[in-house]
Amino acid sequence: MAATLLDVCAVVPAAGFGRRMQTECPKQYLSIGNKTILEHSVHALLAHPRVTRVVIAISPGDHRFAQLPLANHPQITVVDGGNERADSVLAGLQAVAEAQWVLVHDAARPCLHQDDLARLLAISENSRVGGILASPVRDTMKRGESGKNAIAHTVERADLWHALTPQFFPRELLHDCLTRALNEGATITDEASALEYCGFHPALVEGRADNIKVTRPEDLALAEFYLTRTIHQEKA
């Protein structure tokens, strides 16, 4: 079977709370339209025919997920997440030990476009390392002085990218790199950083800048605008 036709599993770490949203409800359970942010994020993955299973890592005390239609979806598996994102991803990887390639997608990134997902999945044909969706930095970037709200210097943006999700890697490689990085006390901010720590260089697959992560209150209205626009375009 050609590599481009291999089935793919996805892991969605959804055990976080997201205190920057300034709400009592975890951000992944806030609603946009008639769905939660988590549902929008997961349905975007399931819309691709290669994605056959999604593992969602939730907090052990989470009582909200069971109320969603996702809880009874035949392609959804739920596992207990950990205190950190990497712990939740590892728990998800353990649940899909049979998978060769795995997507990892943010629970609060609901605006994923199918053409971006298709381009990312296509790299499995020729890559042994995988890659991530990313968007080139377009704004002027400043580095601040340590401990001060003052500019230290301007950062050259020519080779800077915003890391997005999904991120897409061979399952065994990602599992081994995450495990090693955690055991050695490395700072892991996303899955690609674990591979970087172990000496690998994942590909950058340019994706749309409107694939935003809902982190702050103002992001919710922006995500709603992007999703509404996409729905209208699909109906046109």
UniProtKB/Swiss-Prot annotation:
<dbReference type="InterPro" id="IPR050088">
    <property type="entry name" value="IspD/TarI_cytidylyltransf_bact"/>
</dbReference>
<dbReference type="InterPro" id="IPR001228">
    <property type="entry name" value="IspD"/>
</dbReference>
<dbReference type="GO" id="GO:0019288">
    <property type="term" value="P:isopentenyl diphosphate biosynthetic process, methylerythritol 4-phosphate pathway"/>
</dbReference>
<feature type="site" description="Positions MEP for the nucleophilic attack">
    <location>
        <position position="157"/>
    </location>
</feature>
<keyword id="KW-0414">Isoprene biosynthesis</keyword>
<dbReference type="Pfam" id="PF01128">
    <property type="entry name" value="IspD"/>
</dbReference>
<dbReference type="InterPro" id="IPR018294">
    <property type="entry name" value="ISPD_synthase_CS"/>
</dbReference>
<keyword id="KW-0548">Nucleotidyltransferase</keyword>
<feature type="site" description="Positions MEP for the nucleophilic attack">
    <location>
        <position position="213"/>
    </location>
</feature>
<comment type="subunit">
    <text>Homodimer.</text>
</comment>
<protein>
    <recommendedName>
        <fullName>2-C-methyl-D-erythritol 4-phosphate cytidylyltransferase</fullName>
        <ecNumber>2.7.7.60</ecNumber>
    </recommendedName>
</protein>
<feature type="site" description="Transition state stabilizer">
    <location>
        <position position="27"/>
    </location>
</feature>
<dbReference type="InterPro" id="IPR029044">
    <property type="entry name" value="Nucleotide-diphossugar_trans"/>
</dbReference>
<comment type="pathway">
    <text>Isoprenoid biosynthesis; isopentenyl diphosphate biosynthesis via DXP pathway; isopentenyl diphosphate from 1-deoxy-D-xylulose 5-phosphate: step 2/6.</text>
</comment>
<dbReference type="InterPro" id="IPR034683">
    <property type="entry name" value="IspD/TarI"/>
</dbReference>
<comment type="similarity">
    <text>Belongs to the IspD/TarI cytidylyltransferase family. IspD subfamily.</text>
</comment>
<dbReference type="GO" id="GO:0050518">
    <property type="term" value="F:2-C-methyl-D-erythritol 4-phosphate cytidylyltransferase activity"/>
</dbReference>
<keyword id="KW-0808">Transferase</keyword>
<comment type="function">
    <text>Catalyzes the formation of 4-diphosphocytidyl-2-C-methyl-D-erythritol from CTP and 2-C-methyl-D-erythritol 4-phosphate (MEP).</text>
</comment>
<feature type="site" description="Transition state stabilizer">
    <location>
        <position position="20"/>
    </location>
</feature>
